[in-house]
Amino acid sequence: MVYRKSENGLIAGVDEVGRGCLAGPVVACAVILTENLAIPGDSKVLSRAVRLSWYEEIISNSYNAIGMSSVKEIETMNILNATLLAMERALERLPVVPTTVLIDGRDIINNAAKYKEVKSVVSGDKIYGEIKAASIVAKVTRDRLMEGLDLTYPYYRWKFNKGYGTKEHLEALAKYGVTDHHRRKFAPVKRMLLR
């Protein structure tokens, strides 16, 4: 396979999913795409069926790796630092070291000096195929994780809300309380604990 390059070498795109959730880990993905793969959009604009189809295509035609930060890490270091840690873990798990790293958003990873070029790109998931691909793989991975947790905790309907603060999730929190998978320092969960 031939992988996309900049003048500096291999390009990795990085994106995360789950930063604003009330439950579950934050999941990041790093992707180095093959030259012939043109990703149509990021995970937020694709239907579930299209996203799953592209997930399989990306997994088969890229170097890719997942990094996660647990609820405990989110609670200990805050969501921003936990997100950056998940991104760093994803990059470190790639089977090759990219030269250029493109990160969706405004933040730069703490170990940026390891790479020749690191750029944060606001709305990068609308611009760069590598970031679009990373968003798709991260979302499908996290969605599957939350669907698995839903089997043990069906009251919270994580299969549907993926841990976000939907009305039904908040109602379940009020009725059934907080689990070990909830982020206790996030305001809606914290309010439930103070009741």
Swiss-Prot record:
Catalytic activity: Endonucleolytic cleavage to 5'-phosphomonoester
Recorded superkingdom: Bacteria
Entry keywords, A to Z: Cytoplasm, Endonuclease, Hydrolase, Manganese, Metal-binding, Nuclease
SUPFAM superfamilies with a match to the protein in the record: Ribonuclease H-like (SSF53098)
Cell compartment(s), UniProt: Cytoplasm
Cellular component GO terms, alphabetical: cytoplasm; ribonuclease H2 complex
Cofactor: Mn(2+); Mg(2+)
CDD domains from the UniProt entry: RNase_HII_bacteria_HII_like
Cofactor note: Manganese or magnesium. Binds 1 divalent metal ion per monomer in the absence of substrate. May bind a second metal ion after substrate binding.
Pfam families in UniProt: RNase_HII (PF01351)
RNase H type-2 domain location: 9-195
Main location (coarse class): cytoplasm
Molecular function (Gene Ontology), one example: manganese ion binding
Enzyme Commission number(s): 3.1.26.4
Protein name per the record: Ribonuclease HII
Source organism of the structure: Neorickettsia sennetsu (strain ATCC VR-367 / Miyayama) (Ehrlichia sennetsu)
